[in-house]
């Protein structure tokens, strides 16, 4: 990091989703409804962050929100955030919010210099700052199990009982 962006961000997957898909499966969103921002307790204390509260993660390319997850399972002055998108925003007046509100990839580079071996952009070791988001969750984001009711399956007809 540096003085303006003193924390190192790494990103990666969580086991609930395959790459960027399946965010519209209500059962999976109940398990992992929003992206967590994992950080060491000393990092959280240093920046005035409480476990479970909403935080901003910001660098010169933009800022995104996630929920703080304070854990000893990550190095000090490092945070981890999983890429995320919110399909519930696709049917709104601003569908771009689906991929801009909580998607850590907003903070990555979109122009060279890319990884010379793979030709990909950098997903690890991004300098950021992290701080409380007093405004809380993004407006309209589905974060509670009852929010996912519109996506629950509806049965069109009864299923015949074939085993008794």
Task: Label each residue range with its predicted role.
Residues 1-25:
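Long, low-complexity segments enriched in small/aliphatic residues
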Residues 22-38, 42-164:
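Long, contiguous, secondary-structure-rich segments that constitute the structural scaffold
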């Amino acid at each position: 990091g540096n003085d303006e962006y003193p924390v190192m961000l790494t990103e990666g997957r969580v086991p609930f989703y395959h790459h960027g898909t399946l965010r519209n499966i209500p059962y999976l969103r109940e398990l992992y409804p929003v992206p967590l921002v994992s950080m060491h307790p000393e990092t959280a204390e240093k920046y005035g962050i409480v476990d479970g509260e909403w935080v901003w993660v910001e660098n010169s390319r933009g800022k995104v929100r996630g929920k703080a997850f304070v854990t000893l399972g990550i190095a000090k002055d490092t945070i981890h955030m999983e890429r995320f998108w919110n399909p519930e925003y696709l049917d709104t007046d601003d569908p771009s919010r689906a991929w801009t509100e909580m998607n850590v990839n907003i903070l990555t580079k979109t122009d060279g210099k890319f990884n010379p071996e793979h030709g990909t952009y950098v997903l690890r070791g991004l300098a950021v700052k992290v701080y409380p988001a007093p405004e809380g969750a993004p407006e309209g984001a589905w974060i509670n199990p009852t929010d996912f009711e519109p996506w629950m399956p509806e049965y069109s007809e009864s299923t015949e009982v074939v085993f008794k």
